[in-house]
Each structure stands twice: as structure tokens, then as C-alpha cells.
């Protein structure tokens, strides 16, 4: 259900703006998207897991806030990120 350390490192390496960058909005959104996708798969088998569903909604809200911030600061980076992650907007 959670992402592995190797997968998280790969996401950080792929979306980092500079070496060792873990806090940029791109990296945070990529990690949240991976966690959201994992939880979405979890809910296909466990439809009544409402505790995890609340966590999913929190993650989606957090990702939306980060994307809004990125869109306000740099729309080019925003559009590149949502196209590479396949997020609708």
C-alpha cells in the first residue's frame, strides 16, 4: 500500500530540479500522486475501508494545493508536470 524507498528515490531523481531536491512542488506532487494511485488500487478490493479513504481525500487536497501554488508561481512547470504525471486539470 505504501511506496518503497527505491520507488520514492526514483521519483525524487526524476522530478528534482537540482541534486538532492526533495522539497520542490514537483517532487512532492509526484510522490503524492504515486501514493494516491496505490490507494486507488487498494479501494478496488476494499470498498468499505473508510479510514483509508479519508487519508486519500487528504492527500488529494494536499496535492491540489501544491498544484495551485505551482500554477501561480510558474505555469510552464505546472503544465509540464501535469502532462508527465497524467493528471487531469
Swiss-Prot record:
Pfam families: Ribosomal_S15. The keyword Chaperone does not apply. SUPFAM superfamilies: S15/NS1 RNA-binding domain (SSF47060). Disulfide bonds: none annotated. One of the primary rRNA binding proteins, it binds directly to 16S rRNA where it helps nucleate assembly of the platform of the 30S subunit by binding and bridging several RNA helices of the 16S rRNA. Forms an intersubunit bridge (bridge B4) with the 23S rRNA of the 50S subunit in the ribosome. The gene is rpsO. GO terms for biological process: translation. This is Small ribosomal subunit protein uS15. PANTHER family: RIBOSOMAL PROTEIN S15, BACTERIAL AND ORGANELLAR, SMALL RIBOSOMAL SUBUNIT PROTEIN US15M. GO terms for cellular component: cytosolic small ribosomal subunit. Belongs to the universal ribosomal protein uS15 family. One of its GO terms (molecular function) is rRNA binding. Keywords: Ribonucleoprotein, Ribosomal protein, RNA-binding, rRNA-binding. Part of the 30S ribosomal subunit. Forms a bridge to the 50S subunit in the 70S ribosome, contacting the 23S rRNA. InterPro entries: Ribosomal_uS15, Ribosomal_uS15_bac-type, uS15_NS1_RNA-bd_sf.
Amino acid at each position: 500500500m505504501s511506496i518503497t524507498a527505491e520507488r520514492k528515490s526514483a521519483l525524487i531523481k526524476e522530478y528534482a530540479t537540482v541534486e538532492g531536491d526533495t522539497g520542490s512542488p514537483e517532487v512532492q506532487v509526484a510522490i503524492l500522486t504515486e501514493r494516491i494511485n496505490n490507494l486507488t488500487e487498494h479501494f478496488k478490493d476494499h470498498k468499505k475501508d473508510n479510514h483509508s479513504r479519508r487519508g486519500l481525500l487528504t492527500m488529494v487536497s494536499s496535492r491540489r494545493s501544491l498544484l495551485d501554488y505551482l500554477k501561480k508561481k510558474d505555469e510552464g512547470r505546472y503544465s509540464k508536470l501535469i502532462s508527465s504525471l497524467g493528471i487531469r486539470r
